Every structure is written in structure tokens, then in C-alpha cells.
Amino acid sequence: MSKANTTNARRKNRVRMALRRTASGRPRLSVFRSSKHIYAQVIDDLKGVTLASASSLEKTMREAGNTGADIDAAKAVGKLLAERAVKNGVKEVVFDRGGYLYHGRIKALADAARESGLSF
């Protein structure tokens, strides 16, 4: 494993362990970012179930003209995810940035989810 991969894996594990200590039973909003798309899901770790999910690959997102690799797509995914989570009865979550810096697309997704009804 290269040094960069080792560093990223350690950061991801450190963030994830800090979340587990402070979660106190709340579902986790997990984010994955690739170079072309962004994915987010609300996961109940106690039951091992995904409660809501959204990504820039969905048909409605592609029809809207979002490329998936920009801040506008991240905002749309955050808004859609929050709407689906609230519809399923989830209002409080723990934000799992997955080792990514809280900046750019990650921050845009988090802000859009907060504006649409999730609290974290």
C-alpha cells in the first residue's frame, strides 16, 4: 500500500471511530465522492439498514443536466437525500465525511441537507 493510500485509510478510520463514539444511536449520513459523481446515504448502523440514498447518477439528476462533478450536483443530491430521509422519519443524523475534507462538494452537500430538514 502506498503512503498516500495508508494516510487516507488512517484518516477515514479516525473520522469513522470519532463518529461511532458520538453517534449515540443516530443514523449516519455517509458520503462518497468520485471524480465524476457524488453519492450519499443515510445508514442505521445498529440495524445494518440503508434508510435513504441519493446520487448524481440517478435519472432525474442526469435529465436536469447535472454532470455530477460540480457543487450544483452536490447540492441537488443533498437536497434529494434530505427529502427522502425526512419522508422516512429521520431528522437527526451524524455526518460522515469519510475522510474527505469538509470543503467544496462535501460542504455543499451537507449545507443542502441541513437546509432541507436534516440536523447534524
Swiss-Prot record:
InterPro entries: Ribosomal_uL18_bac-type (IPR004389), Ribosomal_uL18_bac/euk (IPR005484). CDD domains: Ribosomal_L18_L5e (cd00432). This is Large ribosomal subunit protein uL18. One of its GO terms (molecular function) is 5S rRNA binding. Belongs to the universal ribosomal protein uL18 family. Pfam families: Ribosomal_L18p. It comes from Rhodopseudomonas palustris (strain BisA53). GO terms for cellular component: cytosolic large ribosomal subunit. The gene is rplR.
